[in-house]
Each structure stands twice: as C-alpha cells, then as structure tokens.
Curated annotation (Swiss-Prot):
Chief location: virion
Name recorded for this polypeptide: Nucleoprotein
Keyword Phosphoprotein: yes
GO molecular function: RNA binding
Transmembrane feature ranges: none
Family, as annotated: Belongs to the betacoronavirus nucleocapsid protein family.
UniProt PTM comment: ADP-ribosylated. The ADP-ribosylation is retained in the virion during infection.
Encoding gene, per UniProt annotation: N
Compartments where located: Virion; Host endoplasmic reticulum-Golgi intermediate compartment; Host Golgi apparatus
Subunit structure: Homooligomer. Both monomeric and oligomeric forms interact with RNA. Interacts with protein M. Interacts with NSP3; this interaction serves to tether the genome to the newly translated replicase-transcriptase complex at a very early stage of infection.
CDD domains: CoV_N-CTD, CoV_N-NTD
Region called RNA-binding, residue ranges: 53-193
Transcription keyword on record: yes
Organism of origin: Human coronavirus HKU1 (isolate N1) (HCoV-HKU1)
C-alpha cells in the first residue's frame, strides 16, 4: 500500500481537495489552479502545465512540500545526519527518506537593464520519486542532497505516492524540533499566514459570510506566498545592513567623555577605574614615590591599555586584601570645605607572590619592569630636554647670551617645581639647610 502525505491510513476523508491534507497552500512555481478566482475583470492568462511552462522555470516533478529558497550567496545546502526530512502526517518514520533537489530559477532584468539570476530553490522528493527516481540513496549527483530518518531503510525506495497537482496541493515544509536549517536559506511560506489563519478558522467557518471571507483570505494568502524576483536580494541586504549596524563601534563625543569622567571622579578614590576618558593622573594624581607605577602610555589609557589585563591577574581578591595585608586605621584632619566630616584612612601593606611557573611570566616581568618607577626616567628625560632645548627667537629681535641662560633656567625650574611631590619638596628643603660638619668626640 502506498502512503500519501497528509492522509491517515483508514481515516474517513472526503475526496477532492479535502482529502486530509494538513494545510493547503498554493505555490507559484508549482500550481496555478483557480487562477480565475482572483483575476476578475482581467484578461485570462494561460495556465502553465508541465509541458507548456517557460524554459528556466519548469518543474517537471511536483514535490509534496514547499521549497527552501537560498537568499545568501556562497552558502551550502546541508542538514545534519538524521535531519532534513519534512514532517508529513500519514507517512511512517520508516518511509522518511529521500533527497533535496536544487531547482535553477529564471533570471530577470533589473532597472538598469542587467540580467540577474535568481538564487536556487530546493524541493524535497521521497526516495524513488521525482527527477532522480531511479537513483540509489547516497549516489553522488550534482544538485542533490540526500536525507533520511534514523529509522528509515535507505536500501529500498519509499512507498509514497507521487503528487497530482490537479487534486493535491503542496504542504508547507515543517521540520521536527531540533532540526537546524541551513544558514542563508528560508522556508517558503514560513511565518506568513499561519499565525493569522489558525485563530479565526473556526469562527469563520461558523459565520454566515464564511464563503466570502474564505475567498478573500485565499486571495490574500495567494498574493502573500508569491516570491518576488528581488525578494532574495532584499533579505540579503537586510541581513547585511543589520550586521553592519551592529558591527559599527559606538562613537564617544566630547560631551559623553565629559559625563564619563564626571561619573568616575564622583566615586570614592578606591573605587575609581581609570580609562582613556579619565586617565590615571585625573583619578589618582601625578606619579611619585608613593604612587610609582605606570609609564606614559599606561597613564594615558589606564585599564584600556592592552597590557593591563595581564597585570589584573596579579591583583589580590577582596579576601586576600583584608586577610593577607597589614591594616592600620588612621584618622585624618577634617578638610577645610567640610569640617564636620570625620575622615579616616585605612593604610595597608602586603605582597603579591608569584614564580616563574605562572602563565605569561616573562610578559608580566617585562610589563612590570617598564612601569615600575617609570616616572623617574620620564622626569629625567623631560628635564634634560627642557634644559637642552633652545628657545625660539622672535623674528627681527636680537637676544643677548644672558637672556638665553635666564630662559633655560626658568623653564627647567618651572618644570621641576610642577613635577615634584610634597615628599620631594621636603627633601629639597632639607638639602637647602646649611652644612654642619660632624664633630669628633
């Protein structure tokens, strides 16, 4: 006995178009029946048959299911093992075997007069039917992809009858849960009218005007299921536009950078995270003996520096900070602008231990050597450049040698005064004290 998709064995189903098919939809490339219904007032168009359809759009064999259309170039049509056979009520799992056949579609002329080829569409045929009815399962054929259920015996043809397009309409392609559809493809008719037709089907059949409603709905479904020539390109452009939109980096304006900086600086000092919008000096001040880490590049980028993540691996956890450090609570004098506040500082000292077996050890050592006390070398280089650089002469003005010396000295003194920390100033004050010779007892 031959199985018919959409028929239950032994069920009482009426003849004709109401023969138990799950859902009936007209597909433009397969059936043109009842064309006069929605062509009133127009000249009747000839009905294409298998022998009279134009070349390039001929489908000599009619599939039981709607097609799968490609909308992205360069994508392979494939299913995982055990997947790819559409759901068909009335066909047992043992007969769920067959192949997908690539149908080359016609070309069309664009607005600028160029010929453009539509991307192919694939149709499913049961094993032993369709254009390769005599082929064995798994045979290497151009434009054929074999699929089968794990329970199907692929050594014998499937016992499924061929579809008669005059009395049997195509079934919308549906797959079992978990099936992965090939990327760059979409199922014809999926998600178009299913959500709109189910809720109102019962109420429409009971109403007095169900015949006119069904006719209008049929007209709507027909026009909605026709694939326009440029539909594949429209979908591809939408996908590419979506990808391009998501891949564009977010631009930060001056106003946004100012807001980010203000948000960081309003946090307590120990909660600030310096970045390229609010650098290290803005968050924690200039480098000196008490804050001696960071070269020029890292001070500028903060945590956005490419080398910072590997240093973050060395940072202690909150538990290690509190339980592995020496802590001292010190009360500070109230600030002048807020004398009513009690200010405390939690002083801490500890160590971070690591050895040469740590992943990325050599890189960590290199980064540490480049950033520890980097401010010392930076100050020395800047001072030497300031003292050795010659001031620009004003055009038409002759400067005396004494003026050059005073300019160099003032520039160097000003730079040193700006870069020294309070600890450095106290050290300079000590050096300015008069020299006292040690007495010999």
């Amino acid at each position: 006995m031959s199985y018919t998709p959409g028929h239950y064995a032994g069920s009482r189903s009426s003849s004709g178009n109401r023969s138990g098919i799950l859902k009936k939809t007209s597909w433009a490339d397969q059936s043109e029946r009842n064309y006069q219904t929605f062509n009133r007032g127009r000249k009747t168009q000839p009905k294409f048959t298998v022998s009279t359809q134009p070349q390039g759009n001929t489908i000599p064999h009619y599939s039981w299911f709607s097609g799968i259309t490609q909308f992205q170039k360069g994508r392979d049509f494939k299913f995982s093992d055990g997947q790819g056979v559409p759901i068909a009520f009335g066909v047992p799992p043992s007969e769920a075997k067959g192949y997908w056949y690539r149908h080359s579609r016609r070309s069309f002329k664009t607005a600028d007069g160029q010929q453009k080829q539509l991307l192919p569409r694939w149709y499913f045929y049961y094993l032993g039917t369709g254009p390769y009815a005599n082929a064995s399962y798994g045979e290497s054929l151009e434009g054929v992809f074999w699929v089968a259920n794990h329970q199907a015996d692929t050594s014998t043809p499937s016992d499924v009858s061929s579809r008669d397009p005059t009395t049997q309409e195509a079934i919308p392609t549906r797959f079992p849960p978990g099936t992965i559809l090939p990327q760059g493809y979409y199922v014809e008719g999926s998600g178009r009218s299913a959500s709109n037709s189910r809720p109102g089907s019962r109420s429409q059949s009971r109403g007095p005007n169900n015949r006119s409603l069904s006719r209008s709905n049929s007209n709507f479904r027909h026009s909605d299921s026709i694939v326009k020539p440029d539909m594949a390109d429209e979908i591809a452009n939408l996908v590419l536009a979506k990808l391009g939109k998501d891949s564009k980096p977010q631009q930060v304006t001056k106003q946004n950078a100012k807001e980010i900086r203000h948000k960081i600086l309003t946090k307590p000092r120990q909660k600030r995270t310096p970045n390229k919008h609010c650098n290290v000096q803005q968050c924690f001040g200039k480098r000196g003996p008490s804050q001696n880490f960071g070269n020029a590049e890292m001070l500028k980028l903060g945590t956005n520096d490419p080398q910072f993540p590997i240093l973050a691996e060395l940072a202690p956890t909150p538990g290690a900070f509190f339980f592995g450090s020496k802590l001292d609570l010190v009360k500070r004098d109230s600030e002048a602008d807020s004398p009513v506040k009690d200010v405390f500082e939690l002083h801490y000292s500890g160590s971070i231990r690591f050895d040469s077996t740590l992943p990325g050890f050599e890189t960590i050592m290199k980064v540490l050597e480049e950033n520890l006390n980097a401010y010392v070398n930076s100050n020395q280089n800047t001072d030497s450049d300031s003292l050795s650089s010659k001031p620009q002469r004003k055009r038409g003005v002759k400067q005396l040698p004494e003026q050059f010396d005073s300019l160099n000295l003032s520039a160097g003194t000003q730079h040193i005064s700006n870069d020294f920390t309070p600890e450095d100033h106290s050290l300079l004050a000590t050096l300015d004290d008069p020299y006292v010779e040690d007495s010999v007892a």
